[in-house]
């Protein structure tokens, strides 16, 4: 059922670009940002993550998207909001503008991947979708813009989101799998089966998630 909403690989870059632009428009209507702020999109492969925001400084961020991972429709806005507007890019841009430049707190020019700021940064980025879109606005935008761009049918979109809301309640199964896989000696194949059974993930998604868990370890609790 879920896989009918996978964005075709040759459409991913276009729909992510559109999503980031819409998230930017909505964010700038409420948050003042430097005139020169901008993001650029880089499509890549061979990574353990789906999306990654690399702040370059001077109010610019490169948003990397991993082509290897299937992108379902809900991830399009999620990636645009989480990685860019009003998520990681906006957070880093405001930290640079308010703390580094205005106050001279140069230590904030360094953004550690693992550190005390991670919980705040990821929590704020996760909340980005809800700041930018109401549930009704999100569905309307996906049905009228994203799905047509991707060549997908939106007839069952509401049903899909009811399913996805239930799926989201299984999120903490990932932390349990991470705990057993990293520290309890759980074999990789068993961990994949757990994610499939208790997290209702496909084998491909479960395998990619384990790669992320292995690389990022306890960082995964930030999500």
Model-derived features: positions:
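N-terminal maturation segment of proteins
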Residues: 1-223
